[in-house]
Design a protein with these regions (language model features):
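Hydrophobic transmembrane alpha-helices
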Residues: 15, 20-91, 204
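Short helix-perturbing small/polar motifs within transmembrane alpha-helices
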Residues: 21-23, 38-46, 125-166
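Hydrophobic alpha-helical transmembrane segments
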Residues: 39-44, 82, 86, 102-103, ...
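Alpha-helical transmembrane segments of multipass membrane proteins
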Residues: 45-53, 87-88, 108, 112, ...
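Interfacial aromatic-anchored transmembrane helix boundaries in multi-pass membrane proteins
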Residues: 57, 108-136, 169
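Terminal transmembrane helical module of multi-pass membrane proteins
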Residues: 154-214
Length: 214
């Protein structure tokens, strides 16, 4: 993850090089208008996360194989869900514009598709569902604050929406209640770590390096 974070840092430095004017925002401000700078940054995040999504496919396969002998194969999906959903919170927290969390997640999934991800075009649907889940969290706070409150709201709505989708898509509705609870808690922890803690770490890294003014 360190190498990927450095890559993202370099991409942002390129973005800053081409965009001279910066807009200062605080933890409780948002940008109401779309700018070329926002679009470029979303594209960079989508590429960064799309590469991660593509790589997770291999990790998912290996983890599923490892967990199958102990009857815990379904947990592979939920253990890695936070990584699959990190583009939404990261984009929403950096761009701070309505719709940015959804676009970041969906476009990240699109990059995964074009890289030849193992789920093919089905990743578009997953990206759409995950994007909606992430966006809802920022909607609940009215796009008026960007701190742990909005980030946790995004994490919670992402977990709820994606879990509801998996009840239909992956047959979670056939699982026993104790297993469902275990999967839900696992998904929440994963999303909190990668969509919450890692997002804040990346934001702080960029803030310290002055690559992006927050």
């Amino acid at each position: 993850m360190t190498a990927l974070t450095k890559l993202f840092h370099k991409l942002l430095l390129l973005e800053v090089f081409f965009m001279e004017n910066k807009t200062q925002t605080s933890n409780h401000q948002h940008q109401s208008k779309w700018t070329l700078r926002n679009i470029i940054l979303i594209a960079l995040i989508a590429i960064f996360c799309g590469i991660i999504f593509w790589g997770i496919g291999f990790l998912y396969t290996a983890l599923t194989v490892a967990l199958t002998p102990i009857g815990a194969a379904p947990f592979a999906n939920d253990i890695l869900m936070g990584l699959w959903c990190m583009a939404g919170p990261l984009t929403g927290f950096l761009i701070r514009t309505a719709g940015s969390a959804f676009l970041g997640e969906f476009l990240g999934a699109a990059v995964e598709v074009f890289l030849g991800g193992q789920w093919g075009a089905g990743a578009f649907i997953s990206g759409l569902v995950q994007g909606v889940g992430s966006e809802l969290g920022f909607t609940l706070t009215g796009y008026k604050r960007y701190d742990w409150v909005s980030l946790n709201a995004s994490i919670l709505t992402t977990v709820i929406v994606t879990f509801a989708w998996d009840m239909y898509k992956n047959g979670y509705n056939k699982f026993a209640l104790p297993l469902l609870i275990g999967l839900f808690v696992t998904r929440y922890i994963s999303t909190f770590i990668f969509g919450g803690i890692l997002t804040k770490m990346i934001v702080k890294l960029l803030d310290r390096s002055n690559a992006f003014s927050l």
